């Protein structure tokens, strides 16, 4: 039986074992999937022992995505662009492939919810690792342009400069947004986890069709509520579909079988 696990600290809250067990049942794959919680500075020892013991693949979450990025023998283009790895796979020759499926999970969920992204004008709020991990997949999906807004404008600009050869991408602080309209706004910050909001003008929602929050809760997140208060016609969604989507992409990297995510999203949401 092929064995997998998710690495993080803390990790007891992770839904990855549930999601991958459901994927395996759906696709008639026989796997074992568990949790691993190394000490904050113990990732390399733990992951080396993990693969030495015969495990096939791992998911990696906070705070170890950069450690996994450095550990991999080879990186996919999307992992290199993200400068972080959330999926490790031991290939038949023994080498370790590092991948990042976060952006693919977001793109798949946005397309599932609202159709193709081709020609859409996007605003990404925040300029941290969550933002960096999704830019290349979004540009590959042929969005018209991406604008990154961040409290510290220079950090947003650095991120835009990094990807400017891949597509039309601009940046600003929260207080000097360009006077353009956005079709889709994605909150890449974790502000909703404690009921907060990004410190950005509500005018961003004027004429926007969609607002997406990367975080998720049992009820609508504070960002989703805010978007609908500002523009009642806007369609909103949280990041649970992204979570399941990135897991499905990892499952495909390992098993070469692509699970159907909608039934799994429904099951996981009922358990929130």
Curated annotation (Swiss-Prot):
GO terms for cellular component: cytosol. Its EC number is 1.1.1.25. HAMAP family: Shikimate_DH_AroE (MF_00222). Keywords: Amino-acid biosynthesis, Aromatic amino acid biosynthesis, NADP, Oxidoreductase. GO terms for molecular function: NADP binding; shikimate 3-dehydrogenase (NADP+) activity. Homodimer. The gene is aroE. It is an enzyme of class 1 (oxidoreductase). GO terms for biological process: amino acid biosynthetic process; aromatic amino acid family biosynthetic process; chorismate biosynthetic process; shikimate metabolic process. Shikimate binds at residues 14-16, 61, 86, 102, 216. Belongs to the shikimate dehydrogenase family. This is Shikimate dehydrogenase (NADP(+)). Pathway: Metabolic intermediate biosynthesis; chorismate biosynthesis; chorismate from D-erythrose 4-phosphate and phosphoenolpyruvate: step 4/7. InterPro entries: Aminoacid_DH-like_N_sf (IPR046346), NAD(P)-bd_dom_sf (IPR036291), SDH_C (IPR041121), Shikimate_DH (IPR011342), Shikimate_DH-bd_N (IPR013708), Shikimate_DH_fam (IPR022893), Shikm_DH/Glu-tRNA_Rdtase (IPR006151). Disulfide bonds: none annotated. NADP(+) binds at residues 126-130, 150-155, 214, 239. Involved in the biosynthesis of the chorismate, which leads to the biosynthesis of aromatic amino acids. Catalyzes the reversible NADPH linked reduction of 3-dehydroshikimate (DHSA) to yield shikimate (SA). The active site is at residue 65. It catalyses: shikimate + NADP(+) = 3-dehydroshikimate + NADPH + H(+).
